[in-house]
Amino acid sequence: MEDAGPLDFAAAPTVRFGLRIEAGTTDVVRSVLLTTQIRIAAQRRPYGPDEQERLNEVFGEPSRWGTTLRSLLWKQTTLVVPPFTGSTLVDMPVECTYDLAVSSAGYLQALGDGEVPLEFLFSGTVFYSSAEGLLRTGLIPWDREAGYRLPVRVLKETMDEHFRGSAWLRVSRETFDRLYAYRATRVLGSFDETVDGLLDRAEADESDPAHEAN
C-alpha cells in the first residue's frame, strides 16, 4: 500500500487505497481478479481515555481488553486489475459507513486521532501470457498480505465530504415513527432540535433530587 485518501466523486463515502502490484516476471499480466480482506489490527495502537470510554461498546471495559481487544473485519472487496507488465499502481476503493451496529464502524467512529492499523489479506487469480503467447493462470497464495496505517484524518475527511458536520443513526421504523410524531406534536423545526430536547429533559431528570430519591 502506497497511500490513501478520499475517493473523489464517489456516490458514498469511500477511501481510495493506492495498491502497488509487482509481477515478479517479464510476462505480460492480462488481468488480476483480486479479492482482499481488510482487517483492523486493534491491538497495534494505543488509546486515550476518551477513546477507551467510547470503545466500551466494542470491546467492553478496558480492564478486560487483555482478552477482548481483537482484530475486526472491516471490509472484503473484489478488484479487477487491468493488463500490465512489471508493476502497476491501482486504486482500491473501500466504502465507509456510519452504521454503528457494525463493530468496525463503531470502532472507527470512536477514534479521535492517530492511525488505524490495517491488515490486507489477498487471494485471487492472475491471468498472464507465457513466453509462447499462451494464456496461463495462477493462484495468489493465501499468505500474501500487506499492512498500512491509515490516518484517522483521512477517514474524517472522507465522511465530511458527504456528511459535513453531520452523522447518521440507524433506528427501527417504530422508533422513528415515535420520534417523528414527537417532533410534529411539538412543532419542532428539525430532528436535531427534537433529539436535543429529549436529551435535555433526560439530563434534567437525572439532576433532579426527587428523581435521585426514586
How would you describe each model-predicted region?
Residues 3-14, 22-30, 109-111:
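Short, solvent-exposed beta-strand/turn "edge" segments of beta-rich domains on protein surfaces
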Residues 18, 34-41, 90-143:
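Internal, hydrophobic beta-strand segments that form the core of beta-sheet-rich folds
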Residues 18-22, 170, 180:
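Short edge beta-strand/loop segments characteristic of extracellular beta-sandwich folds
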Residues 39-50:
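Short aromatic-acidic-glycine turn motif
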Residues 53-62, 127-168:
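Short beta-strand elements
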Residues 54-109:
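Extended, solvent-exposed segments with strong compositional bias
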Residues 173-190:
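Surface-exposed, Lys/Arg-rich phosphate-binding patches that contact polyanionic backbones
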Residues 189-211:
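Short, basic amphipathic alpha-helical segments that act as recognition/interaction helices
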